[in-house]
């Protein structure tokens, strides 16, 4: 039976700590909902369970996906497994357990197939976000408990780096498929490249994104480039700390905090920026890399962050650096050398066109269909059965 025939009428439940409407939602949630839409297009019933937040309905259906929200960002895990145990989702054919550091441990309460979706392993984030015993417990759950609970389950990683990290945790066997992110269509804007030096950083404002490194780079380069501006796009609970850091660094008007913006403004910033800075401690993939690339904006990121080793083609679509000192040096070189910037811009645009949501949805659907059949796979961006040779759209 072809994948599409098998999936039609199946009920897939995603357990996630948040959705895209949540103020703290980001690239991981966009990926989840893109995959959910792909399953809906194949005839699946899809429920996304996530934490409640102010102003959001507890239950709603949007574009074919049923959203159910219960609990807070800490109690959502217990609420999710309780709802699954009490069969409040109705008949379920498969569960996608989204492990953003903390898993739902859904395998303990259901005999249905469970697919574990992982963007990246949080070894570095736990002590940063939760210093002390709480962070140690969280890392123990992710490092030791989860691999044992999900022994024999199918995994989906968004990059080879994440697959490697999972194997290092003991997730063994040919059961970690890689399904890369796609890229959203470009939102038309009237913006053009800034006439004066402009950098941007885009994402949630949380400690492990290390936006301070971008601010420090701008302050260090300001004497040579007095009109240089860094546009910080995004919001989050670390935003006030970043404002304080900019103030303490005497960044002045060199740093522009855009806050949470709509899609049009985000794409205006991508279009205007000369270079995007991605100073994250860890990234599963780096969805914003391809978004910036669609606007011919190359990225500078840390090699040690994991996912950017794949989303950034070092020396062709951007530059991977080793530390904060090299980050500042490379940014300075790019600002001085328009020919180098232009070459990287060409590469960033070309690379961004290789990854599409249509292809990712087909690959994810294949993994889900295989799991329903009781099969495991470690393939990379597979095509659906019965759909050979289709080009990404």
Language-model-detected regions and their locations in the chain:
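Carbohydrate-associated surface elements
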Residues: 161, 179-182
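Short hydrophobic beta-strand element within catalytic cores of glycosyltransferases
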Residues: 289, 298-302
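Membrane-proximal helix-turn-helix segments that form the acceptor-binding/catalytic region
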Residues: 133-155
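Conserved donor-binding/catalytic core segment of Leloir-type glycosyltransferases
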Residues: 156, 189-218, 231
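Conserved acidic donor-binding segment of nucleotide-sugar-dependent glycosyltransferases
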Residues: 303, 313-325, 333-339
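A short, well-ordered alpha-helix in the C-terminal region of glycosyltransferases
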Residues: 227, 340-354, 363
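Aromatic "clamp/platform" in nucleotide-sugar-dependent glycosyltransferases that forms part
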Residues: 281
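Nucleotide-activated donor-binding/catalytic signature segment of Leloir-type glycosyltransferases, i.e.
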Residues: 243-261
């Amino acid at each position: 039976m072809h994948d599409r025939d098998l999936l039609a009428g199946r009920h897939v439940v995603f357990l996630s700590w948040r959705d895209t409407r949540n103020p703290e939602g980001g690239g991981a949630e966009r990926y989840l909902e893109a995959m959910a839409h792909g399953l809906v297009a194949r005839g699946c019933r899809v429920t996304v369970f996530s934490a409640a937040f102010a102003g959001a309905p507890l239950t709603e259906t949007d574009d074919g996906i049923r959203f159910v929200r219960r609990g807070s960002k800490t109690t959502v895990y217990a609420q999710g497994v309780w709802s699954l145990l009490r069969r409040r989702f109705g008949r379920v054919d498969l569960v996608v357990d989204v492990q953003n550091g903390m898993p739902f441990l859904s395998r303990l309460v259901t005999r249905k197939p469970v697919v574990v979706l992982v963007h990246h392993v949080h070894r570095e984030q736990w002590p940063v976000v939760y210093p002390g015993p709480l962070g140690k417990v969280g890392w123990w759950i992710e490092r030791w408990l989860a691999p044992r609970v999900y022994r024999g389950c199918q995994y989906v990683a968004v990059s080879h780096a994440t697959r490697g990290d999972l194997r290092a945790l003991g997730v063994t066997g040919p059961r970690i498929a890689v399904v890369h992110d796609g890229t959203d269509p470009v939102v038309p804007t009237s913006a053009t490249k800034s006439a004066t030096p402009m950098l941007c950083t885009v994402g949630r404002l949380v400690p492990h994104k290390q936006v301070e490194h971008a601010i420090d780079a701008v302050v260090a380069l300001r004497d040579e480039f007095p009109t240089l501006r860094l546009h910080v796009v995004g919001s989050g609970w670390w935003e006030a700390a970043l404002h304080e850091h900019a103030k303490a660094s005497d960044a002045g008007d060199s740093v522009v905090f855009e806050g949470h913006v709509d899609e049009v403004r985000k794409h205006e910033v991508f279009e205007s920026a000369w270079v995007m800075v991605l100073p994250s401690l860890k990234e599963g993939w780096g969805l914003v890399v391809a978004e910036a690339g669609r606007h011919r904006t190359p990225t500078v990121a840390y090699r040690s962050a994991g996912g950017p080793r794949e989303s950034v083609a070092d020396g062709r679509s951007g530059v991977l650096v080793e530390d904060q000192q090299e980050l500042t040096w490379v940014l300075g070189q790019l600002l001085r050398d328009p020919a180098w910037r232009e070459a990287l811009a060409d590469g960033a645009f070309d690379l961004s066109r290789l990854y599409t949501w249509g292809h990712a949805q087909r690959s994810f659907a294949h993994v889900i269909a295989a799991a329903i059949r009781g099969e495991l796979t470690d393939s990379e961006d597979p095509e659906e059965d019965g759909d050979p040779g289709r080009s990404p759209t």
